[in-house]
Amino acid sequence: MGAMNTDVKAKYFKAISSSTVDICANQTNSGGGDMTLTTGTGVFTGGSESNRIAAAVNITSTAGDSNNGVTFNVVGIGKDGVSTVSESGITGPAGSSTVTTGQVYTKVTQIVHSGTVTNVSCGFAASTSGLVFGGRTRIRGLHGVSSATAGELQFYNNDSASGTVLLTIDTPNQDDMLDPYIPDDGVVFDSNGCFASLGTGITSVTVFYDG
């Protein structure tokens, strides 16, 4: 029997908590240049390449030193896990405060500062969402782990958490496995893509989809 061809793919999403230091920790650098990342090749959300959660970046003045006279550029990989994205001209934080990017990333590869920075750390903001696929697709199945908080796992007919929710799965208020029934033909998403929102009820989920 020959090999079976299939277009079904899988993506893994695991919710992350807000962090101050997982990208770079408490750095003081003279003049313009690059922040030194905790991993030279770039830092993934949740620290794992397999995690496709997309998150904004926190830039924090960890002490009373003000860094709002400096601008930052953040470069990395976007929510699709492939495309390079960036946000430029971000005004740095005042003393003991945080600024957050509008852009979201699955991996940060470079953070550039325009001038001297003092006691600056960078980390990912909390996130529970990510892009399943950036075009027409079908959800074929999923396997997840629920948390101790009841909630909803939602899938948007879009490439972001906006628009019509086509699939909602309630989750129990207990740590448990989640293996819901999905019809044989799947659930079709025919707009700009399919975007997953784990909410508070899901710790992680693997989504099987047409890609």
Model-identified regions with their sequence ranges:
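Surface-exposed, low-hydrophobicity beta-strand/loop segments enriched in small/polar/acidic residues
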Residues: 1-211
